[in-house]
């Protein structure tokens, strides 16, 4: 189970940047049973199951072009390997994304820099004092970001 991250964790840069975001490996598990089970649930669970059904129909239709649209920093949130696998396995035909998704975050990690698990409740003044940027509950070392920008 993931450890709980509460308000005002850490007091220095090293303690704040101690848990890198891990990218999900879609090949490491079979999610079909849980998604099938969601079709009998409520709220967005049924929507998720229906979306999976539609996606499977799209994959089966050789005349269908599949566009993956991204906004925001989903790659920073742990989806970068997922997107790579979708392309490698011909599960999407095109990607439409904001600059933050591809230029900033993917390039940042391609250079070897990391995103870190954090807290949306962390005091922003403390983060600024430690030269750390925050994307909701994800941290970036500002010095790494500046090195990326200079590349």
Describe each model-derived feature in a short phrase.
Residues 2-146:
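Metallocofactor- and cofactor-centric catalytic cores in central/energy metabolism, strongly enriched
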Residues 147-151:
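Conserved anion/nucleotide-ligand pocket segment
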């Amino acid at each position: 189970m993931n450890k709980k991250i509460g308000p005002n964790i850490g007091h220095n840069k090293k303690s704040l940047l101690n848990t890198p975001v891990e990218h999900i490996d879609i090949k490491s598990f079979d999610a079909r049973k849980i998604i099938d089970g969601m079709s009998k649930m409520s709220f967005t669970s049924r929507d998720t199951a229906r979306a999976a059904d539609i996606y499977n129909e799209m994959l089966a239709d050789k005349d269908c072009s599949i566009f993956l649209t991204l906004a925001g920093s989903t790659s920073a949130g742990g989806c970068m390997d997922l997107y790579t696998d979708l392309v490698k396995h011909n599960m999407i035909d095109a990607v439409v994304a904001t600059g933050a998704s591809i230029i900033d975050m993917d390039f940042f990690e391609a250079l070897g820099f990391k995103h870190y698990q954090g807290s949306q409740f962390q005091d922003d003044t403390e983060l600024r004092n430690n030269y750390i940027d925050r994307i909701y509950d994800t941290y970036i070392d500002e010095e790494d970001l500046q090195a990326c920008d200079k590349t």
